[in-house]
Structure formats: C-alpha cells, structure tokens
Swiss-Prot record:
This is Ribonuclease. Its main location: secreted. Pfam families: RnaseA. It comes from Chelonia mydas. InterPro entries: RNaseA, RNaseA-like_dom_sf, RNaseA_AS, RNaseA_domain. It is an enzyme of class 4 (lyase). The lineage of its organism: Eukaryota, Metazoa, Chordata, Craniata, Vertebrata. Belongs to the pancreatic ribonuclease family. One of its GO terms (cellular component) is extracellular region. Keywords: Disulfide bond, Endonuclease, Hydrolase, Lyase, Nuclease, Secreted.
Amino acid sequence: ETRYEKFLRQHVDYPRTAAPDTRTYCNQMMQRRGMTSPVCKFTNTFVHASAASITTICGPGGAPAGGNLRDSTASFALTTCRLQGGSQRPPCNYNGGTSTQRIRIACDGGLPVHYDRAI
C-alpha cells in the first residue's frame, strides 16, 4: 500500500456511504477501512469528495502551508470520527460530527499522502 493509497483508504469516502446517523457511520467506516485493529485509532476524518478534487490541493487548488503541507482553497464536506472512552482496545465505539471546512494536507509527488487537519 502506497502512502497515497493509505490516504485514500483512511480519508476519502465519496459519495458518502449511507448510514442512519454519524455514530453508525463512524463505527462502520472505521472498521471497514481497517482503523480498528490492532488498536482503535483515536480520531479520523473522512472527506466526502473525489480523489481527483482532493488531489488538486497539491496543485492549483491549494496554497503552501509550510513544508509539504498545503491548504485547500475550496471547502469540503467532512465527517470526523472520535473514539469514545479512553481505551484503544476493540471493540471501538465512535461518535461522529459533520462539517464543511477547508483542509490541510501533505502532498508528495503531486499526490495527497497525509491529512493534517480542518482549517
């Protein structure tokens, strides 16, 4: 798995997978995308946009933010999943929140390889 492929697996869900609520969405998606074993990842953000549109941040759709980080000029629909309780041992139970924000990512060779944060 390349760094780009890992970015896609962990952070891109487009179109957004249907779920009755954000809690169910997060519990399903975190498990489905391999972020609940061997330990539960504390927090993770899914971007509901195409890989192509996110990749533009590495070029004309983004501005330098220091090092290999770039800030998107556009806003994206996001779902952020946060682990409930202190234990990182499965079963993992997540709560989720949705927002529309600009994002900061790291690029390598013109491709997104790391999600830094919403800005």
